Each structure stands twice: as structure tokens, then as C-alpha cells.
Amino acid sequence: TRQMVNELNYAFNLMKDADSLGSIMKFNLSDSTRLLVKQTVEFWERETAIPEIIQEQMSAFRLILALTDTYSTLVMNPPYLESGNMNSILSLYVNENYKTGKNDLFTTFMLLAINLLQSNGKFGMINMDTWVYKSSFIGIREYILENTNIDSMLMLGARTFEELSGEVVQNVCFCITNSAPYNSGLYLNVSTANTCENKHQLFNSERNKLIEI
């Protein structure tokens, strides 16, 4: 149908910017168009001889399916990139499609994770802790607090990884459920420990005293 053609044309045009956008691309396919893509992939995967032009399209079709599916569980360590350092293609797309998470690419991925989750699905993520307290991230904080449930949060601070020796990158990891808030969550701060090993030891010694707010 014309709708299917238009949706697939949009998807393939969007993928021309895949080097800049990666997995934050939104294809917005109708159920019927997605089913067509799925059936096409399944058909050619059963064939022993696949024309070269089809082979070239199969990876694109698989990407479309992956980014239009929903998941019960996701685990992410997203890229960090402040909005001011994004190229024009990425900046425009994030502003138009992930406005609440536009401050940094890692907050964009927080919204992406929620979009990809099934109802009551969960995602775990480690990223920079700036979204937890900086005023410029109030939009993403409000969205998370109002629309999801924070199951647990671990404030890691600096030197989370042995290869990161400075104070610039300070981390937090957390687990979130894609549902309306239903409990207060568990919280632990190990940021006072100054090495990766010390954080691990502090976590093990304190985990039975997790703070429930």
C-alpha cells in the first residue's frame, strides 16, 4: 500500500544518517509495515541463494526490526556527548525527537530505553551522575520521577573504572521499571571510596543497609 511505501521510504532515508544517529533512530512503522519487513526477512533467511541487492537490504531490515521491537529487559552503557558537541544532524534529530533528553546523548538513551521497553519492563544503565542533580537536567529528572519507577540507584562517583583516574567522569548506575511509580526504591552511595576496588568493598559491606526512601 501507499502507506507502507511511504513508511519504508522514510526509514531508508533516515538510515542515510545512521552514522550520526545510530540506534536512536525512530522508524514509526505501522503494525502492517513492520509485519511485511519481518516476513521479508524470514523469507530470505530460508533461501540458500540471496540476490546481492537483497543481501544489502537485509541488514537494514534487521535494524528496523530491532529498533521497532519492544523488550522486557535492557542493559546499557550509553555514549556521553554534551549537546554542544553534537554535529548538526544529531543535534537537530535529538531536539525534535528526544527534547526532554537533549542535554546529553546519555539522557537521550534513557528515553530510548523507556521507548523500547514493554509495559513493566526494566532497564539497567550506568551513566554520568549529572542528570541526578544539575538544574539543566530537571526535565529528564521530572520525566523519570513522574513516568517510571526507580527500583534502585548506586551513586558511584569518580574512578568507577580503573582506567579512569580523574574526577571528570562521575558515574551513577540504576535500574528503572517502565511503569507508573509504585515504590520508593533502594539507594546506596559509594562515591566516597576513591578507587574501583574500594567502591566494590564498600558496596559489599553496606548493601545490607541500603537506604529506602
Regions found by a protein language model. Name each.
Residues T1-D69, T73:
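Class I S-adenosyl-L-methionine-dependent methyltransferase module
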Residues L65-I213:
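Signature of N6-adenine DNA methyltransferases within the class I
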